[in-house]
C-alpha cells in the first residue's frame, strides 16, 4: 500500500492510499491528485508551507517513508503586470549572494544559510540570486520558510573559459544533466520563480551563444513550464568583436576619461577593473549603443525575462525594443539604488533589481575596500581576503547602504545617520562603482574634537532637522533621500527628525 498524507503545521489536511501488487524487481509510477479546500497560499508576506509524507506499507507496518515540503501558489510574469504571486504584483527587492558563508567556507550548512536569509529579509530584501551556481537545498529551504524569492542560476561560464581549467572544460557534456538535477531539486520549492541560464557569458553576443541560450532556456521550459528563464547579460562581455568600435565611440564622446588601471590577473578581476570606468553617463551611453543592442538581441529573444548586469541605461529602452518582455536588473551597483528603484517603481515591465552584493563574500578581494595610500582595488593587497561590498558585512552587520536601501524601498520611516570616518578627513581614497561611502553610524570620535565631520541623514521625509546635544543644526530638504551636514565634532548625542508636509 502506498499512502500519502498532506499536513500543514503538523495537522493532517488530507490522506489517500493506493493498493499495489508488484512482482519482484518491478517498478511503477503512481499518481495522486487532490483538491485542497481553502489552501493557505505561499507568498513572500505569508510563506505558508505544507508537508507531503509518502509511506510504503505492508498491512499497517511501515516499510519506507519520504517527506517533502512544498507551498501552494500561482506565478505569472509579464511586461504589463510584472511578477504576480497569487495575482498580486511583487517587485523584486533583490540581493545577489555568493556561495560561501565567510570564514565557514563553501559548505552548505543549514543554520548558516537560515541565518543569512533571515538577516537579508530583515534588511528589506525579498529575493536572492544564487550567484553563480545552483542553490543548495538548505538555502532553498530557508527561502521557503522566510518568504524570499529565488533566481536560481546555472553557471558562470558556458563553452568559453574565464579562467584556466574552469567549468568551460565540462559545460558541453554536463549542461543537460545539470539542468535536470537543478529542476528536480527546485521543483517543490515555492520560493524559486526564475531560472538564470548564465552570468556574464563571454559568447552571449555570438550566433553560437544565442543558440546555446535557446537550448538552455528550452530545456528548462520542457522540464518545468511553471517557471521563467533569464540570462544575466553583461554588455562588455557580450559585445565581442563589436567592443572595439563601441569603445571608440565612447572615448570620442568622453575624451577626458582615463584608461583602465589596477586589477591583477584575469577573470572577474580584469573585467571588474575595466567596468569601474563604465558607470554614470558613460555607462549609459555604452549601454544604449546600437551595436550592443545587436549583440544582446539573440539571447534576449529566447529568454522569458531580459536580465541585465550593469546596463541601467537599457532598463527603459528594452521595453521599446521588446514591449512584451519583462526586464530585470540582474546585477547592479549598490550606490545606484535611488535611480534604479525609481525606474522599477515607474515601469511595470521592470520587475526588480538585484544589487551586487547583498552579503559580503570571500574573493574579488578588496573590491570595496577604501585605499587612502594609493593602493588599487582588485589588486589582492595583503591581507585583503573579502570583497567588502555587501549591504551586510561578513559578520552579518548591516552597513549604512543597507539602511538607505531600506528607506528607498519604503520599508523604513525613521531617519538613519552615518558619518564619514573622521580619521580620513581630507584624504582621497580609491573608488569603484561597487563602493558606497566609507561611513558608519557612530558619533564617538575621540581625539577629533573640533574637527568637522561629514554627516549624512537618510530619510524618506521631505525635510530633516539635525540636533546635536539638543541644539538644532537646521533643516535641510532631502535630495535623493539624503541630506548632508558639516558638523564640528563634539561628544554627545546626534539626532535627526524627519518632516513631511511641515510636520
Question: What do these predicted regions represent?
Answer:
Residues 171-189, 223, 286-291:
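An active-site-proximal structural segment forming one wall of the substrate-binding cleft
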Residues 149-157:
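Beta-strand-loop-alpha-helix segment that lines the small-molecule cofactor/substrate pocket
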Residues 135-136, 157-158, 235, 359:
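Positions that flank functional sites
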Residues 102, 139-140, 161-163, 205, ...:
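Short Asp/Glu-rich motifs
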Residues 40, 44, 96-111, 119, ...:
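The substrate-binding groove and active-site-proximal loops of carbohydrate-active enzymes
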Amino acid at each position: 500500500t502506498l499512502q500519502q498524507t498532506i499536513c500543514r503545521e503538523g495537522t493532517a489536511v488530507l490522506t489517500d492510499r493506493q493498493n499495489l501488487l508488484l512482482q519482484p524487481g518491478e517498478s511503477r509510477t503512481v499518481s495522486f491528485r487532490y483538491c485542497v479546500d481553502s489552501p493557505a497560499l505561499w507568498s513572500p508576506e505569508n510563506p505558508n508551507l505544507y508537508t507531503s509524507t509518502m509511506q510504503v506499507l505492508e498491512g499497517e507496518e511501515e516499510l519506507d517513508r519520504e517527506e517533502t515540503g512544498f507551498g501552494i501558489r500561482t506565478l505569472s510574469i509579464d511586461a504589463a503586470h510584472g511578477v504576480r504571486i497569487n495575482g498580486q504584483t511583487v517587485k523584486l527587492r533583490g540581493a545577489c549572494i555568493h556561495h560561501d558563508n565567510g570564514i565557514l567556507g563553501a559548505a552548505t550548512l543549514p543554520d548558516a544559510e537560515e541565518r543569512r536569509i533571515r538577516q537579508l529579509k530583515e534588511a528589506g530584501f525579498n529575493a536572492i540570486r544564487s550567484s553563480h551556481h545552483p542553490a543548495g537545498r538548505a538555502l532553498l529551504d530557508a527561502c521557503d520558510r522566510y518568504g524570499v524569492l529565488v533566481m536560481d542560476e546555472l553557471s558562470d561560464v558556458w563553452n568559453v573559459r574565464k579562467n584556466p581549467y574552469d567549468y568551460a572544460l565540462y559545460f558541453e557534456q554536463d549542461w543537460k544533466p545539470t539542468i535536470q538535477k537543478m529542476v528536480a531539486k527546485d521543483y517543490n520549492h515555492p520560493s524559486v520563480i526564475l531560472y538564470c541560464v548564465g552570468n556574464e557569458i563571454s559568447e552571449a553576443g555570438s550566433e553560437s551563444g544565442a543558440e546555446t541560450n535557446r537550448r538552455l532556456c528550452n530545456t528548462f521550459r520542457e522540464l518545468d513550464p511553471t517557471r521563467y528563464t533569464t540570462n544575466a547579460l553583461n554588455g562588455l562581455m557580450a559585445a565581442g568583436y563589436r567592443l572595439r568600435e563601441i569603445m571608440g565611440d565612447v572615448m570620442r564622446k568622453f575624451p577626458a576619461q582615463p584608461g583602465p588601471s589596477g586589477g591583477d590577473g584575469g577573470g572577474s578581476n580584469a573585467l571588474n577593473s575595466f567596468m569601474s570606468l563604465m558607470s554614470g553617463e558613460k555607462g549609459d551611453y555604452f549601454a544604449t549603443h546600437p551595436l550592443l543592442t545587436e549583440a544582446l538581441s539573440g539571447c534576449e529573444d529566447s529568454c522569458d525575462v531580459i536580465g541585465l548586469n550593469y546596463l541601467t541605461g537599457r532598463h527603459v529602452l528594452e521595453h521599446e525594443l521588446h514591449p512584451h518582455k519583462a526586464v530585470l536588473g540582474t546585477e547592479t551597483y549598490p550606490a545606484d539604488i535611488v535611480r534604479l528603484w525609481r525606474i522599477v517603481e515607474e515601469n511595470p515591465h521592470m520587475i526588480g533589481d538585484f544589487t551586487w552584493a547583498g552579503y559580503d563574500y570571500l574573493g574579488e578581494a578588496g573590491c570595496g575596500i577604501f585605499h587612502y595610500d594609493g593602493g588599487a582595488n582588485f589588486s589582492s593587497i595583503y591581507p585583503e581576503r573579502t570583497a567588502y561590498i555587501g549591504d551586510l558585512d561578513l559578520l552579518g552587520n548591516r552597513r549604512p547602504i543597507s539602511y538607505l536601501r531600506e528607506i528607498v524601498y519604503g520599508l523604513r520611516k525613521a531617519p538613519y545617520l552615518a558619518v564619514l570616518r573622521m580619521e580620513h578627513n581630507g584624504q582621497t581614497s580609491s573608488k569603484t562603482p561597487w563602493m558606497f561611502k566609507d561611513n558608519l553610524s557612530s558619533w564617538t570620535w575621540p581625539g577629533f574634537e573640533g574637527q568637522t565631520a561629514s554627516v549624512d541623514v537618510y530619510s524618506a521625509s521631505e525635510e530633516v532637522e539635525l540636533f546635536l546635544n539638543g541644539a538644532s543644526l537646521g533643516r535641510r530638504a532631502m535630495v535623493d533621500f539624503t541630506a548632508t551636514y558639516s558638523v564640528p565634532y563634539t561628544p554627545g548625542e546626534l539626532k535627526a527628525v524627519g518632516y513631511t508636509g511641515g510636520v
